[in-house]
Each structure stands twice: as C-alpha cells, then as structure tokens.
UniProtKB/Swiss-Prot annotation:
Bilayer topology: Multi-pass membrane protein
Record flagged with keyword Membrane: yes
UniProt protein name: Altered inheritance of mitochondria protein 11
Keyword entries, A-Z: Membrane, Transmembrane, Transmembrane helix
Any GO CC annotation of this UniProt entry: membrane
Disulfide bonds: none
Compartment(s): Membrane
Organism: Eremothecium gossypii (strain ATCC 10895 / CBS 109.51 / FGSC 9923 / NRRL Y-1056) (Yeast)
Length: 179
C-alpha cells in the first residue's frame, strides 16, 4: 500500500465514525411544522394547467404577431431599395409616393412596437401568474402594501372548489396537530 493513500483512508474513516456518532445520539431533533401553501396544492388541478396554457398561448400569439410584423417590415424595406440597372443613373431618385411610404412605415413601426410591448406585458403576466385585470390590480396593491385582508382574496382568486376544500382540510389537520 502506498503512503499517499493513507490520508484519504483516514479522512474517510473519520467521516464514517462522525456520522455514526451523530446518528446514535439519544435526543431526536425537533422538526418544524410543515406548512403547505394553497398555491402548492393548486398546481396539480386541471384549472391551474388550463390557466397556464392560456397564458402561454397569449404570449406565443404576441410573439407570432411580432415575428410577422418584423418579416413584413423587412420585406417592405427590401422592396423599396433602389438598385439601378445598367444604363440608369444612380444619383437620380426613383419615383415613389411619399404618402404611401409614410403610411407603410407607420404601419410597420406600429406593428413592431405593439408586438414588442405585447410580448413584454404578456410574458411578465405569464411569469407572475396573472390572467385578468382585477387579479393584476390585486397583485399591485399587495406589492404596494395593501392590508392582508385584501391580499387574502388574491390567493383564492384562481382556485377551483376542490383545491379550496383540500387546503381547508390540510389546514384543519395542521391546526389539530398543533393543539
């Protein structure tokens, strides 16, 4: 046996004996009471899955609109590019309708801006699990320090009946266990 292996064997032996001493202690450690939130329960309901699917589809719809607007704007820019032929002057401006070009530029810019902002807003709402305007206002009020009685409505705002019943049963069981 080489001398280089001996320190590793010694360290391993010390770890094993320390673990066995720790498990042999006679006083068990008190465990903190387990608290299950209503949100953790509602993750498994079909209503929650449908809600998240709707948020995802809204975001992907905004993304598709943005990509379509970008493609149209790119294609419109390429079509307006002036490439002179063999015997045409390159310093001469081609005939074009300035009103039509302004209208197209406004439409492309509006489409890109609307799509970008829609992606930003819907993506943020998807991450924050917000589906409706009243739910958004409740979340903002909770962030700004509204009283807890108002924020209690926020937790139960998007739960189905079965989830609320299960949460009530678990809370009552935990209360009985504490008493």
């Amino acid at each position: 046996m080489s001398l280089a292996i001996i320190p590793f064997i010694t360290i391993g032996w010390l770890r094993c004996t320390r673990k066995s001493r720790d498990t042999m202690s006679s006083s068990p450690e008190p465990q903190a009471p387990m608290h299950v939130t209503q949100r953790q329960i509602s993750v498994f309901s079909d209503e929650f899955r449908q809600r998240r699917r709707q948020q995802m589809l809204r975001f992907f719809g905004a993304t598709a609109f943005t990509l379509l607007s970008a493609r149209l704007a790119f294609r419109g820019t390429i079509n307006r590019k002036y490439v002179p032929n063999m015997f045409q002057l390159n310093h001469r401006v081609p005939l074009a309708s300035s009103q039509g070009e302004a209208l197209h530029a406004f439409a492309y810019g509006s489409g890109l801006a609307t799509g970008g902002f829609a992606m930003l807003i819907l993506g943020t709402c998807w991450l924050a699990d917000v589906s409706t305007v009243p739910e958004f206002s409740l979340r903002i009020k909770a962030l700004l320090g509204e009283s807890d009685t108002q924020s209690g409505r926020l937790e139960s705002a998007h739960q189905d009946k079965e989830t609320r019943e299960l949460a009530a049963m678990l809370d009552s069981l935990l209360q009985e266990k504490k008493d």
